[in-house]
Design a protein with these regions (language model features):
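Polar, enzyme-active/binding microenvironments
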Residues: 1-175
Length: 175
């Protein structure tokens, strides 16, 4: 079944996703137009209960690539990324209301290519690549309070990049 299309067919490379029970959010990182790729700051959304094309939501505070997202019931969060250097930035949107992303705080390190997940109250970013090397470190934010992330622990195994994460109310998994 065809759900719909993104607003620009060339968007989609490196998108991270989040949302709520009613909206799906796409935070894009690259526009792939032959022969070049451009880093972008585009946010789009779909209404999950109905088919149709994605609509413009707003923009990230800065264009970046290889960032990751997690969501609470009311907000979607973007962590890190590159453009061209690594970022410590955490941004958020209020999922139910269109508009531009806002600054939330910073990760403890500049990083990209990791994975994020969360539950209703907490988001966790782990893995990826920081300035030194691949990392297995995890850090957390409390969704309700603007501020910086704090160290949370490590994911099992040596550092990895281009990984995925999924979670429910009590556990997060990285692979």
């Amino acid at each position: 079944i065809d759900f719909g299309n993104l607003t620009a067919q060339s968007l989609g490379f490196g998108a991270s996703t989040g949302g709520s029970e009613t909206r799906g959010i796409f935070m894009f990182s690259m526009q792939s137009s032959s022969p070049t790729r451009t880093v972008v700051d585009v946010i789009e959304f779909v209404t999950i209960s109905q088919t149709g094309n994605a609509l413009d939501f707003g923009n990230l505070t800065a264009a970046s690539q290889t960032h990751q997202c997690s969501s609470s019931p009311t907000r979607t969060f973007k962590y890190g990324g590159f453009n061209p250097s690594r970022s410590k930035g955490i941004e958020f949107i209020t999922t139910a209301t269109t508009g531009n992303a806002q600054d939330f705080g910073d990760l403890t390190r500049a990083v990209g290519r990791g994975a994020a997940c969360g539950n209703a109250t907490r988001g966790i970013y782990a893995g990826g690549e920081d300035d030194a090397a691949l990392t297995d470190e995890a850090e957390k934010i409390e969704y309700a309070t603007l501020g910086n992330a704090v160290e949370f622990g490590d994911v099992v195994g040596s550092g990895r990049e281009y990984i995925s994460a999924v979670s429910n109310r009590v556990r997060g998994l990285w692979s």
